[in-house]
A protein has these predicted regions:
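Basic helix-extension-helix modules of the SAP/HeH family
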Residues: 1-44
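Juxta-kinase regulatory segment immediately upstream of eukaryotic protein kinase catalytic domains
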Residues: 38-59
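ATP-binding glycine-rich loop module of kinase domains
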Residues: 58-59, 63-98
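A conserved alpha-helical element in kinase catalytic cores
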Residues: 84-116, 146, 191
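Conserved structural core of kinase catalytic domains
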Residues: 108-147
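Conserved alphaE helix
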Residues: 143-157
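Catalytic-loop of the protein kinase fold
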Residues: 160-175
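C-lobe/activation-segment region of protein kinase-like
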Residues: 176-244
């Protein structure tokens, strides 16, 4: 940042910057400029110290709606997945995503959150092995019944934890060993009375996510075998309406 340009500003302009940064308002411009410059330098040092904690090794998967996920390594050699966000991602939204993923991870259905930063906009978590879609390819394009049971188990636990995931994209399911996890809580919401009233069910993961996933699998022309167990959790009305 070019701090010299700040000196070209008027007292009133400098005062407005100081107010926006919650800094002390001083009687002369020079003192306020020192405070502003010091605050910016502290911020830059903070960002550098956080970014230096992790070395980006490679991109994981495709670029998402909100940003990119990387494989990162710490100085001690530990490897994690870092989900980065665009600058527009608000701190409150990022914190909400962290909170809901932590709630899910405590139940063993989502990657554990290792670290996060609302300034540099990232969440660091345990890295997974492979996507469900990659596993499906090796299985002849189908989801095994045992894997469908894991998905339903995930949905039930999320409902119990009052966390509505909200995105049934098959890309949001990953394995660590043989254990299936759900990832990307960017669209997740807390299950509240207002949400229950809006969606018409107190178990939206079972009743909405299951339908969403089955429809995605049908759209991908997957064998009915891939959702034979899943569709047992759909209502008769849902099955008739969507020809499942």
């Amino acid at each position: 940042m070019n701090y010299n340009k700040l000196e070209e500003l008027s007292y009133q302009e400098v005062k407005e910057i100081a107010e926006n940064m919650s800094l002390r308002i001083r009687r002369n411009k020079e003192d306020m400029l020192k405070d502003i410059t010091s605050a910016f330098k502290d911020y830059e040092r903070y960002k550098k110290s956080k970014s230096d904690k992790y070395t980006r090794v490679k991109q994981i998967g495709e670029k998402g709606k909100e940003g990119i996920t990387y494989l990162v390594k710490t100085k001690s050699g530990s490897e994690y997945a870092m989900k980065t966000f665009r600058a527009q991602k608000s701190s409150s939204k990022l914190l909400q995503e962290v909170e809901l993923q932590k709630a899910a991870s405590e139940l063993g259905v989502a990657p554990r959150v290792i670290d996060y930063d609302t300034v540099s906009k990232y969440i660091v978590m345990d890295k997974m092995d492979k996507h469900l879609l990659d596993v499906m390819k090796k299985q002849g394009g189908v989801i095994l019944k045992t894997q469908q049971k894991q998905i339903i188990s995930i949905y039930k636990k999320l409902d119990e934890a009052n966390v509505f995931h909200g995105d049934a994209n098959p890309l949001n399911y990953m394995f660590l060993g043989k254990q299936l996890y759900i990832i990307d809580f960017g669209m997740s919401k807390k299950i509240t009375n207002s949400l229950i009233k809006k969606v018409g069910t107190s178990t939206p993961n079972i009743h909405i996510m299951t339908l969403g996933l089955v429809l995605k699998l049908k759209e991908m022309n997957c064998s009915p075998e891939s959702y034979e167990y899943l569709k047992k959790f759909l209502s008769e009305e849902q099955r008739k309406q969507f020809c499942i």
